[in-house]
Amino acid sequence: MTEDIRVRYAPSPTGHLHIGNARTAIFNWLFARHYNGKFIIRIEDTDSARNIADGEKSQLENLAWLGLDWDESPEKPGEYGPYRQSERNEQGIYQPFIDKLLTEGLAYKSYKTSEQLASEREAQQAAKQAPHYVYEYEGLTREEREAKYAEFEAKGLKPVVRFRVPEEKTYAWDDIVKGHIEIGAKEVGGDWVIQKADGMPTYNFAVVVDDHMMKISHVLRGDDHVSNTPKQMMIFEALGWDIPQFGHMALIINGETGKKLSKRDENVLQFVEQYKALGYQPQAMVNFIGLLGWSPKGEDEIFSLEEFKQMFDETRLSKANAKFDQKKLEWINNQWMRRDLEEIMPQLIQELVTANLVSPADATAKADWLAQVIKVAGVEGISYTREIVDLVRQPFFELGDITDEMVAYLTSEEGRRVFDAWESAYIALPDDATAEDYLNAIRGIQNQLEIKGRNLWNPIRIATTHEVQGPNLPEMLVVLDKATVLQTMADVKSNYLN
């Protein structure tokens, strides 16, 4: 592309950063960065009743956590600010364009009450008509319409401003993702509100003014905005402005139900900060989200944000719905944890502090030992960092109960022989014995007693760790405190073998 690319991510601060919104932001960022364009963040806060106090903060902090940067935003203003719609409204940016449409007869003031609107909808339903707004000034001249305005104003009524929909027109565009789309003006539900009674512009009006004034070249957003596009095209055309290119990404569906991902789906965590709190890695989240509705060439599935940027191709955005597969996210996150183990080690150790397995002081003083424990336990079996707690809890920080199955191994004739041989071998090994030393000692017992497999390994593991399975035993023995292991073995002998 040779044109100047300017794209925007424009969230409403009515909630925290949702997976779907994160995908919109990521793909806009990729589009901008791949083509050396600009990525703008604009806050669409016109619905003040639904805005939450930390909604904007959550959006920006979590976007930054994902590794995204931006060229313009409320906190990084450029020449096209302000970047909050509420502030733009306070500065009177929208009103001249409302007035222009009113003056040209392309919009009008409507004083209908909610009761009148409800009555009209009921009548339409009774007549089996599609819901639509009924124009109340049919046949009136501009002067007669102005007189009606004055009459309503005298009664203390506050109007909304509605755009006069050209009913016979069809709005068509070549969607970046979905291809050619046509929607008839009649499908938008009649004349629609562009300014509320409190003077605040509605979303579909404000977004057009903002996109034009901020020189947005491409609008890449979710499939649920397709129905908004003809309304926005109406305003672009009415004001004589160029229309940006639109692209509507496929829905994200619940991988289990096959239905659109809903905030009511309690089986799926849907907000980025929830995954962040569990210890998912930002690279993994970007990797997973970047594959929701977009496919690279080849079979590889592990990509960094930089790799995504280099190979991004908007023509590979899928028309088919994207399946949210929790298991795949867990697999991708595990791949990134294994790849970046040294980098995330402080985070893993902090999980142990949070779970009260170690004190903050020991987390620092024993950092090397804790890192050894984590490496021996292995992150291969966990999906996110918080799971490291249960992985290392036993036997590194506490011992589990000895079960009847374990007792059977210990008290069998072979088990007693293995225990006695292992006790002697372990005591004889030096404190700095290596994993190879421990393995050779166990092999020596195998050769001496001619016992192998579970009948050899289980009595040793039970006597040492109170477990029948777990990480590599010789490697565990290297990091376990020898005095502690000797006490564990003494207790086992006293309780079960005397």
UniProtKB/Swiss-Prot annotation:
Q: Which GO terms describe its cellular component?
A: cytosol
Question: Which positions in this protein are listed as binding ATP?
Answer: K263
Motif: 'HIGH' region; annotated at: 11-21
Q: Which Pfam families match?
A: Anticodon_2, tRNA-synt_1c
Gene Ontology molecular function: any one: glutamate-tRNA ligase activity
Motif 'KMSKS' region per UniProt: ranges? 260-264
Xref: Gene3D superfamilies: 1.10.10.350, HUPs (3.40.50.620)
Could you tell me the EC number(s) of this protein? 6.1.1.17
Q: Which GO terms describe its biological process?
A: glutamyl-tRNA aminoacylation
How is this protein organized at the quaternary level?
Answer: Monomer.
According to UniProt, the name of this protein is: Glutamate--tRNA ligase
What gene is behind this protein?
A: gltX
